[in-house]
UniProtKB/Swiss-Prot annotation:
One of its GO terms (cellular component) is cytoskeleton. PANTHER family: ACTIN. It is found in: Cytoplasm, Cytoskeleton. Disulfide bonds: none annotated. Its EC number is 3.6.4.-. InterPro entries: Actin, Actin/actin-like_CS, Actin_CS, ATPase_NBD. This is Actin-3. Gene3D superfamilies: 3.30.420.40, Actin, Chain A, domain 4. The modification N-acetylaspartate is found at D3. Belongs to the actin family.
Length: 376
């Protein structure tokens, strides 16, 4: 399917980043921040051709003069005008395609409200005139990307984390759990604990620097208390990081204290269970007969699962919670940052999937509610 003329488009809209590309490719062609920026002040330069809004990287680079908004909060679209701008930017500026010539596969958060799926469907057919479209649940696509149809996915991105048990390709809605703790919270927490060390990061520009520190230097400790002791008694865990202005900062126990919040949300002042317990609780909400398959197929997905050491720690924590004879396997594919998109690329290029698309004709006959009958 390298034939871009008929290739389906796959668009994974996350709270933090939008991933887009062509079905059949092994990675997204475009990855950009899910932000829309509007000028704070009237243009000073007359005739500068000032745009009334900027999307993605351009909004990010001009953030000094813009008000930035994220149209997707905790995985769910909350601002449709801005969302439309992001899709427009995706098709015309990033992929440089005419959406009316390609089927479009969109992704949605687990437990996405029904009205939202209908609105996505309506915008695709009425605003972008797509010939066909489909809406797939993000975690299910991640599971497909790992070559499975049964398992439990811990999907953790920038705005939200979910544990989604899936049996024979179907997500089990009664057992899906959501945790409002994800990448953005960890970045904020790292800003806070670096401030305690005497480094001050406050602006949105500095937040991006901290996000980079987090992605490059943080890791999950197998045993938190032991790691804290090691960090206190030696400098073996210290790493240095050069800021854009050339100043070098040193970071020690912050490296593993930051992602530890995933396992101990109390660090962030949250009362919820950690990701290990949430995964276990999700499994326990499932039928007793399928739990064995879920324990043995626990798949990590999303950018916030990219910390070194996270799979070993999950293995250790879930082993402590599960029955002692249970076989537990944590699958952490190296490409898991993009596994939702990759799963979409695989799905949309399957010959057996071609009958699953919602066509323009079906939409015209049934209206937006067709999405509930065809996408589940």
């Amino acid at each position: 399917m390298c034939d871009d003329e008929v290739a389906a488009l796959v668009v994974d809209n996350g709270s933090g980043m939008c991933k887009a590309g062509f079905a059949g490719d092994d990675a997204p062609r475009a990855v950009f921040p899910s932000i829309v920026g509007r000028p704070r002040h009237q243009g000073v330069m007359v005739g500068m051709g000032q745009k009334d809004s900027y999307v993605g990287d351009e909004a990010q680079s001009k953030r000094g003069i813009l008000t930035l908004k994220y149209p997707i909060e905790h995985g769910i679209v909350t601002n449709w005008d801005d969302m439309e701008k992001i899709w427009h930017h995706t098709f015309y500026n990033e992929l440089r395609v005419a959406p009316e010539e390609h089927p479009v596969l969109l992704t949605e958060a687990p437990l996405n409200p029904k009205a939202n799926r209908e609105k996505m469907t309506q915008i695709m057919f009425e605003t972008f005139n797509t010939p066909a479209m489909y809406v797939a649940i993000q975690a299910v696509l991640s599971l497909y990307a790992s070559g499975r149809t049964t398992g439990i996915v811990l999907d953790s991105g920038d705005g939200v984390s979910h544990t989604v048990p899936i049996y024979e390709g179907y997500a089990l809605p009664h057992a899906i759990l959501r945790l409002d703790l994800a990448g953005r919270d960890l970045t904020d927490y790292l800003m806070k604990i670096l401030t305690e060390r005497g480094y001050s990061f406050t602006t949105t520009a500095e937040r991006e620097i901290v996000r980079d520190i987090k992605e490059k230097l943080c890791y999950v400790a197998l045993d938190f208390d032991q790691e804290m002791a090691t960090a206190a008694s030696s400098s073996s865990l210290e790493k240095s990081y050069e800021l854009p202005d050339g100043q070098v900062i040193t970071i020690g126990n912050e490296r593993f204290r930051c992602p530890e919040a995933l396992f101990q949300p109390s660090f962030l002042g949250m009362e919820s269970s950690g990701i290990h317990e949430t995964t276990y609780n999700s499994i326990m909400k499932c039928d007793i007969d399928i739990r064995k398959d879920l324990y043995a197929n626990t798949v990590l997905s999303g950018g916030t699962t990219m910390y070194p050491g996270i799979a070993d720690r999950m293995q250790k924590e879930i082993t402590a919670l599960a029955p002692s004879t249970m076989k537990i396997k944590i699958i952490a594919p190296p490409e898991r940052k993009y596994s939702v998109w990759i799963g979409g690329s695989i799905l949309a290029s399957l010959s057996t999937f071609q009958q699953m698309w919602i066509s323009k004709q079906e939409y015209d006959e049934s209206g937006p509610s067709i999405v509930h009958r065809k996408c589940f």
